[in-house]
Amino acid sequence: MKENYVAAGFKKTVSERFPAEADALNAMFNARLEELRAQNAGASPEKLRHLEGQIMPGVAAYEALQNVMPKDEALKTIHDYVEERAWKLKGIFQKIAGFPGVYRLIPGLFVKGTRKMFGESAGFAAKEIQTGKGVWRIDMVKCPYHDACVRYGCPELCPCFCDSDDITYDELHPKLAWHRTKTLGRGDDCCDFCLKIKAK
């Protein structure tokens, strides 16, 4: 199985910058990750995808890094991991969106994808505002990223994941508009997502 990108980034950071403490930091990261897994053992497969993919490694790495660097630097380090991955994803999505006519399908794919991978079983709750005619517009009122970061005492970590959405989906295609003014992770009442085909 491919190594989680946060775990890989963490290992690289500690081996390059803190070689003397690397073994202890990796052990700390792994122990905390196992502890988080035990605490979330009852999570649904849909929610585990998010927990294992980003949330739990993010929390474990953030906590471990604070043993060798200031809190704000640890936060920036995690943000860098997330941002690097977001730019890679953006490149892939831009290539797909660049095929003739594909951009027209993307809002509809967001509708289906949100319902499948970002639904209640995954720990999300969305209010659909408009999901048709070239528009995907929802208010996400519950998010497991936000909930977990608050639960584990690091609400400041959540905006790292919020920012990744903006990096990945903004300017996917010249004829698509990405818009969001609020996020739960930044203290707002919802994440007001919108992706739509631009008016002619």
List each model region and its residues.
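C-terminal non-catalytic interaction appendages of large macromolecular assemblies
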Residues: 134-139, 144-148, 152-200
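Hydrophobic, Leu/Ile/Phe/Ala-enriched alpha-helical segments that form helix-helix packing faces
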Residues: 14, 65, 118, 165-168, ...
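N-terminal, charged low-complexity regulatory/assembly segments
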Residues: 1-65
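Amphipathic interaction/junction segments at domain boundaries or subunit interfaces
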Residues: 53, 63-153, 157
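Secondary-structure boundary/capping signal
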Residues: 22, 73, 176-177
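Charge-rich, low-complexity amphipathic helices
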Residues: 36, 83-87, 96-104, 167-171, ...
